[in-house]
Amino acid sequence: MNYDFLIVGQGITGSIVALQLKKNSKKFKLIDGQSQSTSSKVATGIVHPISLKRCNLTWRGREFYEFSDSFYKEINFESNIELYKPYKLLRIFTSFEEQNNWIGKTNNKIYKNILNLNNVELDNLKDRFGIGVVELCSRLSVNEFLDFVRTSILKSNCLIKDVFKANELKLKNNRFHYKGDTYSKIIMCEGVNALKNPMFNYLPLIPNKGELLKVFSTILPSEIINCGIFSLPETKNIFTIGSTYSNKDLNPNISIDAKEYLMKKLNKIIKTDGIEIMDQKFGFRPTSLDRKPLVGEHPIIKNLFTVNGMGSKAILMAPLLVRELLDYIYQKNPLDSLVNINRFSKKINDENIDYANSVEL
């Protein structure tokens, strides 16, 4: 069978690729082995355009937010499920300096309708420096979103439940051949698993481990709160606490250190006596050396593409970056130079060259 695309990986990014290809009436297959340690499995779904630590708009923040907001609202309509909804995020200040910086930003037109101050007193919180509000904030129910996409592509007979094996891919007459089917193009959305693949493992991808706690509490507020870590309400008296960031701990297990770190940080803003830890999870975020996404075409194998390296911001960035990649493929629109993987073309090595040569029949 002939297809336009093969998508590799059904995390957040691969799911978004599938949805956009479907909308554009492209014929595709998606292959996914359901890795349990990907960041998508533990992503909390919080979406906003602010770097809370520095109280700044992130790179292309408003642009990414406005596009992703429209994208997910459309998915709500199509699925008839509220997978995505608005929230207010409360930032608990840790110093008068942070408070003053935030207040200054609220008077800046760039941050109009994004930043505000909280004037409602919240019980139980230690907030002596005050609280800021991120008005432009939403949440995607990630697991439900992934399930919706998976069910949709299963119904369309577009899902291959298997681990992609790069050594079984061949290229003949400008078409990729994989397990009996042929494809015009391939988009790799592997996250940290790209490091195991000779296609794109020359890219400086850095696994960043994140750990979360699921807790029971009768005193945590019903809003999303952030104080270096976050508390996210799930159901009545159930919250997610997170997250850690470590590019040194590559152990594929939860850690006591992470649990203690999260509870210690939480204790700075609320008494943790009586908060019961119910579960702990981990995942590895795909980050890059220069902290910018990795998007573009393989330097040797034409029509082989990747979208990766968004770290914890895939939910925010992926809808627009995927659109820009498809515009590059079909309209020849240039990719943003800050995300284009050609910036790392000098890092390609003998393993990658040998693999590229082996693909050709």
Task: Please annotate each region the language model reported.
Residues 45-128:
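Dinucleotide-binding Rossmann-like beta1-alpha1 core, especially the glycine-rich loop
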Residues 13-24, 41, 46, 51, ...:
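Active-site substrate-recognition segment that forms the wall
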Residues 133-185, 189, 193:
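Helical element adjacent to the flavin cofactor pocket in flavoenzyme catalytic cores
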Residues 278-361:
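C-terminal catalytic lobe of FAD-dependent flavoproteins
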Residues 27-32:
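Short beta-strand "acidic-cap" motif of Rossmann-like dinucleotide-binding folds
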